[in-house]
């Protein structure tokens, strides 16, 4: 599979699991591995993050029925999690640093979230921090509405309860 080299396309920031640099579109992705070197990494740790970046880079080819005519985008991908278990506190700290050091990016994708439903009476701490980061940095987060792990889950999970984010499912 071949796609043209990037030229003047805008860059979207991705904060997710790891990225596999061996994929056909890797020329379009500037990858930063933020996971501690002492944490073991398995091949499965690269699957989700790579899939997210693939849709941003080559979505029209991978999902032609969803082609919106916007074309391809370059990606600056920050791998912040390996494995299914990660600390939301640690991820939020990393997000703050990543945003502060990448002021040129205005649109950020975050597909990491909880499979547990949000509380009916207040927004999550993670969502509140994302809202604060967006307001302070004039950016927008595109946040996954959370995958539905089973039929009993009806509501979104954190941080998809962010008020200022664009939430997609």
Task: Tell me the role of every PLM-derived stretch.
Residues 81-165:
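Substrate-binding/access-modulating region of protease and related hydrolase catalytic domains
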Residues 23-29, 35-37, 118-122, 152-154:
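A short acidic (Asp/Glu
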Residues 2-32, 39-88, 138, 162-165:
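Subtilisin-like serine protease catalytic core
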Residues 1, 36, 111-112:
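A generic structural motif
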């Amino acid at each position: 599979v071949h796609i043209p080299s990037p030229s003047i396309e805008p860059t979207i920031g991705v904060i997710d699991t790891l990225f596999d640099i061996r994929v056909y579109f890797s020329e379009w992705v500037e990858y930063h591995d933020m996971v501690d070197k002492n944490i073991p990494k398995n091949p499965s740790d690269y699957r989700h993050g790579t899939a997210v970046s693939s849709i941003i880079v080559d979505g029209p080819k991978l999902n032609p029925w969803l082609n919106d005519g916007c074309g391809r985008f370059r990606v600056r991908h920050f791998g912040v999690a390996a494995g299914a278990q990660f600390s939301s506190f640690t991820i939020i700290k990393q997000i703050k640093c990543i945003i502060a050091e990448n002021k040129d990016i205005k649109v950020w994708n975050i597909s990491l979230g909880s499979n547990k439903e949000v509380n009916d009476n207040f927004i999550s701490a993670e969502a509140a921090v994302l809202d604060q980061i967006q307001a302070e940095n004039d950016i927008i987060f595109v946040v996954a509405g959370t995958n539905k792990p089973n039929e009993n889950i009806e509501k979104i999970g954190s941080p998809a309860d962010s008020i200022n984010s664009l939430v997609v499912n």
